[in-house]
Amino acid sequence: VPLFLDKDIGGPLARTVVDAVAIFDVIAGYDPADPVTAASQGKRADSYSKFLDKDGVRGMRLGVVRQLFTPQNTDPDVMKRMEQALADLRRLGAQIVDPVHIAEIDTIPPGMLFCFRFKFDINDYLPRLAPGAQVKTLEDIIKSTKFHPSIEKRLHDRQAEPPLAENQRCMQVAQNTQRMREAVQKVMDDNTLDALVYPTWAFPPRMIGDLNTPHGNNSPRLSPPTGFPAITVPMGFVRDSLPVGLQVLGRAWSEPTLIKIVYGYEQATRHRRPPASTPPLPAGQ
């Protein structure tokens, strides 16, 4: 289901880096039904599992994007976990460049990196999904009233969007995303970095139904606008039981490097705690 079709990407959600890489080995590469993946032809590794290196952090140069987690916009406990993650990365042999500065993070509002094209993409998607269905457009969804009240305004706002070819906002977004891509690439080149690091979220998870507490979602700040790959790995817990993540972002086609970094970090820190609601599976299942 499209949300931002020009930014959306399907990736594995898994218990461990090993599991995520096993899935990635299957889904990575060119898909004729997804034109965006055409650029990956000739760039896919024969196997990504070979980059699972327990010593993968050693020698990596990692830039810290503190603009995404200042004391003013980040939960104090998340800050502590991030500082510990940086200490762990240093202990594992990484060279930490702290901080690095990406001017466009300050000059481009986060919302101006996304074109609201949902209406056009969902109107294209639904008829192809089920040609005989009664609901074929966003307008049909709105008329049905079969949606959560919390998203009603957003649905009406998306329905009011002008055609993409006439949408001035989307034209500006296209320019902004190019600026952000070039800025991130330049910072990495200027500092000879292998990857950038920052907390995936600046605040702990919110309670279900809480739409007002700050959430501080950093995961879409750099990766979707640039198209560069990123991997999140657990970096501990806050409030005893709420997980927080470390996001590691690299250049285009740098998945092998990212896998080395996150696997080495995961194996050395072992932050994951299986939830009590999901007991271990018997061996081989």
Labelled PLM ranges:
Residues 49-67, 116-185, 234-243:
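Short helix-loop capping/hinge segments that flank enzyme active sites or metal/cofactor-binding pockets
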Residues 25-32, 87-94, 115, 123-131, ...:
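Sec-exported extracytoplasmic/periplasmic mature domains
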